[in-house]
């Protein structure tokens, strides 16, 4: 690190919904000449993922309380005090000019110690319903940013930082107009898959006449690919009959861009990516998400006519088949165009600019 180089500390962990947007901002700041250090949990996915991106790490051990037993709750004061001490040590070693909190349990002790040490704290909430940690830390932060309007009071709506290739996708009008033939449907359950989609979609397609069926790419989740193959076989589909089954998709930008319709869950990053690309979506929120935030995430697009929201309890093969019969490429293109108008494709740059400004940096460095 040079004497004039500024440092950003990103604190995020636990799930990809926190880590991936943090990485997008981290890379943007590195491109602008900043040093970036990541604060995470040694037991979290970030401990494996972040070093692969060449970003050095500091660690704090701290877990959540939701669904945990009595022992965890009784030891909370000791664990919290230890996490605060570890956070303070990391802050003293790294000496960041600004700290960006992207969520995860470690954000609470690290965020508190950031504020108490007098360093500027910037918070970003990815979901439409803010978690408890960000609700508390928002009172201590210098700037508060949200991906969905209204998630936190007095916050700035920046959108979710996403991968650059998603924001560069060709506009939906041009993509849809260039296609003919059956609709292209992408089914995505996330990296772990979604059992409800894996079960219902094959049966729904079987209810459609051959001439009504779309072409389908169905991402199963690595652990569920064999079960998904069995589901399609049970529904009467032989391999290669207009259906391609994959365990994981590396290039989501290309997959979204090739689709007329995406059938998926409605995690914060999924909703933000779909809007950024501009593609029609049928959202089936995960019914056990904390505070049912996936329903509210999906409603952001659905309420504007930019997507369709179906609760898992209402989803059936018959309902899905009937709905698919009523869709055309033109109707889906209109939905996709509305979705694109609600996107925040410059979110990564905007969050980076806010961090720079909070540190007192010249914004020209991020232009």
Curated annotation (Swiss-Prot):
It catalyses: di-trans,octa-cis-undecaprenyl diphospho-N-acetyl-alpha-D-muramoyl-L-alanyl-D-glutamyl-meso-2,6-diaminopimeloyl-D-alanyl-D-alanine + UDP-N-acetyl-alpha-D-glucosamine = di-trans,octa-cis-undecaprenyl diphospho-[N-acetyl-alpha-D-glucosaminyl-(1->4)]-N-acetyl-alpha-D-muramoyl-L-alanyl-D-glutamyl-meso-2,6-diaminopimeloyl-D-alanyl-D-alanine + UDP + H(+). UDP-N-acetyl-alpha-D-glucosamine binds at residues 15-17, 127, 163, 191, 249, 294. It is found in: Cell inner membrane. InterPro entries: GlcNAc_MurG, Glyco_trans_28_C, GlycoTrans_28_N. GO terms for biological process: carbohydrate metabolic process; cell division; cell wall organization; lipid glycosylation; peptidoglycan biosynthetic process; regulation of cell shape. SUPFAM superfamilies: UDP-Glycosyltransferase/glycogen phosphorylase. Keywords: Cell cycle, Cell division, Cell inner membrane, Cell membrane, Cell shape, Cell wall biogenesis/degradation, Glycosyltransferase, Membrane, Peptidoglycan synthesis, Transferase. Its main location: membrane. Transmembrane segments: none annotated. Its EC number is 2.4.1.227. This is UDP-N-acetylglucosamine--N-acetylmuramyl-(pentapeptide) pyrophosphoryl-undecaprenol N-acetylglucosamine transferase. It comes from Burkholderia orbicola (strain MC0-3).
């Amino acid at each position: 690190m040079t004497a004039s180089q500024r440092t950003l500390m990103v604190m995020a962990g636990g799930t990809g919904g926190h880590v991936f947007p943090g990485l997008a901002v981290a890379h943007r700041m590195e491109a602008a000449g900043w040093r970036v250090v990541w604060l995470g949990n040694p037991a979290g996915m970030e401990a494996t993922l972040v070093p692969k991106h060449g970003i050095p790490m500091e660690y704090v051990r701290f877990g959540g309380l939701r669904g945990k037993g009595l022992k965890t709750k009784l030891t909370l004061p000791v664990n919290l005090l230890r996490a605060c001490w570890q956070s303070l040590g990391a802050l003293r070693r790294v000496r960041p000019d600004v700290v960006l909190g992207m969520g995860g349990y470690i954000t609470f002790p690290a965020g508190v110690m950031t504020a108490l040490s007098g360093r500027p704290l910037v918070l970003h909430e990815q979901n439409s319903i803010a978690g408890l940690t960000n609700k508390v830390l928002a009172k201590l932060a210098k700037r508060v940013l949200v991906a969905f309007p209204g998630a936190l009071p007095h916050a700035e709506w920046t959108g979710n930082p996403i991968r650059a290739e998603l924001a560069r996708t060709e506009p939906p009008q041009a993509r849809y107009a260039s296609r003919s033939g059956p609709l292209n449907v992408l089914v995505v359950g996330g990296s772990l898959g979604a059992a409800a989609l894996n079960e219902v979609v094959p049966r729904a397609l079987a209810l459609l006449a051959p001439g009504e069926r779309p072409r389908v790419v169905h991402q199963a989740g690595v652990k569920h690919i064999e079960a998904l193959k069995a589901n399609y076989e049970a529904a009467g589909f032989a391999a290669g009959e207009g259906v391609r089954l994959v365990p994981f998709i590396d290039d989501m930008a290309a997959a979204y861009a090739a689709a007329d319709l995406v059938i998926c869950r409605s995690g914060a990053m999924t909703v933000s990516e779909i809007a950024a690309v501009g593609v029609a979506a049928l959202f089936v929120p995960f019914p056990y998400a904390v505070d049912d935030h996936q329903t509210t995430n999906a409603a952001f697009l659905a309420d504007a006519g930019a997507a369709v929201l179906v609760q898992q309890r209402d989803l059936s093969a018959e309902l899905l088949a009937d709905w698919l019969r009523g869709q055309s490429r033109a109707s889906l293109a209109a939905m996709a165009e509305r979705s694109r108008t609600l996107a925040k494709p410059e979110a990564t740059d905007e969050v980076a600019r806010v961090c720079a400004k909070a540190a007192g940096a010249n914004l020209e460095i991020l232009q």
